[in-house]
């Protein structure tokens, strides 16, 4: 993944090891990246906030911040198109969408994602074709305002809630996601995660 980013001209890379038990952090420290580590597994939302906070600390005036999955699902080739609206001042946040181009999303995951998008619309009034995609580009303004408090997968819904509350301008850009046997196997817990996300959305909307 890092080599692919380097090949596309991206070199200011932050890797957040979210308490993994393998050699991810050790390997990352040997590569030309900023390697950060959570000593306990906290979840993707926590890892994103750690990385964004670090980026703003090290570079108080970044042109933009990209969030990019480290499992090989995202293509570095999609970053330029994703970042263009933000760099041109046309959007505060640019969101990658698997459903604006030829989609190779497996059926079960497609149903889950479309259901999630519908719930996002019901709760927040924003219609997005792909509400839970990890490939995003944030402007400096959005990066500073973002404060993710949901540690796990429900962070994607929280980001959209923040978009609505802060009145960020946004756009969706077509991307291609590569699914491997490993990433599909990890997706088998998707129903449980979906219920967790729904419960969190209800709590934030009606109880908090």
PLM features: what roles do these ranges have?
Residues 1-7:
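Short, well-formed alpha-helical segments that are part of the catalytic scaffolds
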Residues 9, 30-32:
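Short, structured coil segments at secondary-structure junctions
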Residues 11-13, 169:
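Residues at the starts of beta-strands that form the adenosine-phosphate
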Residues 17-25, 72:
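A conserved acidic beta->alpha catalytic loop
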Residues 34-55, 76-153, 179-202:
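Acceptor/aglycone-binding surface of glycosyltransferases and processive sugar-polymer synthases
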Residues 59-73:
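Short beta-strand-to-loop acidic/aromatic patch adjacent to the donor-nucleotide binding site
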Residues 64, 92-93, 170:
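Short, Asp-centered acidic motifs that coordinate Mg2+ and/or phosphate
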Residues 127, 148-151, 160-178:
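Catalytic donor-sugar/metal-binding loop of nucleotide-sugar-dependent glycosyltransferases
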């Amino acid at each position: 993944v890092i080599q692919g980013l380097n090949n596309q001209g991206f070199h200011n890379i932050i890797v957040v090891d979210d308490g993994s038990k393998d050699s991810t952090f050790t390997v990352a420290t040997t590569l030309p990246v900023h390697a950060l580590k959570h000593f306990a597994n906290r979840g993707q939302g926590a890892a994103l906030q750690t990385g964004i906070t670090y980026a703003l600390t090290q570079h108080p005036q970044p042109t933009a911040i990209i969030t990019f999955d480290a499992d090989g699902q995202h293509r570095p080739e999609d970053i330029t198109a994703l970042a263009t609206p933000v760099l041109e001042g046309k959007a505060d946040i640019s969101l990658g969408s698997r459903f604006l181009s030829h989609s190779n999303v497996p059926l079960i995951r497609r149903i889950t994602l479309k259901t999630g998008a519908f719930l996002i619309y019901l709760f927040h009034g924003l219609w997005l074709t792909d509400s839970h995609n990890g490939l995003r580009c944030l402007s400096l303004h959005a990066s500073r305002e973002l404060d993710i408090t949901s540690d796990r997968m429900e962070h994607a819904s929280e980001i959209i809630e923040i978009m609505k509350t802060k009145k960020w301008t946004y756009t969706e850009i077509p991307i291609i996601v590569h699914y491997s046997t490993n990433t599909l196997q990890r997706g088998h817990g998707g129903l449980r995660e979906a219920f967790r996300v729904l419960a969190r959305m209800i709590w934030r909307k009606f109880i908090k």
